[in-house]
């Protein structure tokens, strides 16, 4: 972690751990993931007609809404480099609002090579699957967002909020073993399932 004023502010928002449990380590998003920019309508043939995930497909509970995906013609050569893979994290890099900062992140769990993602988003793709689980990283970033840390990572121009990528990609990530990650993910999802059951019964 780079110790500067920005990092200190982020540490206050997401929690600064002076000593991690045995077996944990700390790295950053940019070391863990490739970051890939999105695309939009193509200008040079050949084209391919594909569905493109947009900010509008992000639900309030940070899931992917497939009901209104927009299909457009994109350049085939660009799509070959920017199609979604199962386990990708789609990050809103432009958009947001005063009440909802930019930086919302959803986990793509669909078929690989079918959809792409818009130029208002980007993808985090884990470099080494034996390092971190995509679901663990998804819940990790979600927790950071819910704590309000993304407000320190955005600029605003004419009502549009933009993610400061260098700051976002410098987020420290605390990583346990894969087995511990799986235990944490299972526990989180068990709690969410219980909450859903309670809400449905009201």
Indicate where each model-derived feature is located.
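Sequence-specific dsDNA recognition surfaces
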Residues: 12-13, 30-42, 56-89, 96-99
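Short amphipathic alpha-helical coupling segments at ligand-binding clamshell hinges
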Residues: 133-140, 180, 187
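A short glycine-rich beta-alpha junction/loop motif
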Residues: 114-122, 150, 154-175
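Ligand-binding loop in jelly-roll beta-barrel domains
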Residues: 125-133
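Non-catalytic DNA-recognition/assembly elements of restriction-modification systems
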Residues: 8-39, 170, 174-186, 190-202
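Short, ligand-facing micro-motifs at secondary-structure edges
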Residues: 59-70, 92-117, 135-139, 148-154, ...
